[in-house]
């Protein structure tokens, strides 16, 4: 079995947003929203669904800054005033288990090697299957219907990392 680790976005990239006005956010093409559906606003720094009434930023994020044709950015939700949550090795955050997901596998050069769409409850099996391919260096999880990036999944060589 290959060990893996879910990697959330670093909240420090977004902390400055907490101090901006609606006008300043708008000038940066960022929208401050109030969560009105649960689940429905998956946060990329906590890898949890934001709670009803909570505020989230909707931003365009450069989630695959590679020198390949697969360079990509897209919309993501960031919970206001939250810190990055770290997950232990081989732990899958529960927000992934109830979504239709797209798993994209990349090599060390940022080239896509494999991809699949499936229900989240089989995510662990898909991660293990993909990481059995030695050419695959890392994975990206996206929400399949809207196509939005969720997080990076790294292959971990040593269970103590």
Language model: regions and residue ranges:
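Short, hydrophobic/π-rich interface segment
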Residues: 102-138, 142, 155-157
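Short, well-ordered loop/turn elements at secondary-structure boundaries
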Residues: 51-52, 72, 134-136, 144-145
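Generic beta-strand structural signal
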Residues: 74, 99-101, 137-139, 147-149
């Amino acid at each position: 079995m290959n060990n893996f680790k879910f990697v959330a976005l670093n909240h420090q990239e977004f902390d400055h947003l907490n101090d901006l006005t609606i006008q300043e956010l708008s000038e940066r093409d960022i929208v401050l929203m109030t969560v009105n559906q649960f689940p429905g606003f998956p946060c990329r720094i906590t890898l949890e669904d934001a709670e009803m009434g909570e505020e989230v930023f909707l931003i365009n994020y450069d989630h695959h800054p590679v020198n390949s044709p697969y360079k990509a950015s897209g919309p993501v939700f960031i919970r206001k005033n939250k810190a990055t949550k770290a997950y232990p090795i081989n732990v899958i955050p529960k927000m992934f288990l109830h979504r239709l997901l797209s798993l994209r596998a990349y090599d060390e050069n940022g080239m896509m090697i494999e991809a699949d769409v499936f229900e989240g409850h089989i995510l662990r099996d898909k991660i293990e299957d993909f990481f059995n391919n030695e050419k695959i260096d890392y994975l990206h999880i996206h929400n399949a219907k809207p196509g939005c990036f969720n997080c990076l999944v790294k292959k971990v060589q040593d269970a103590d990392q």
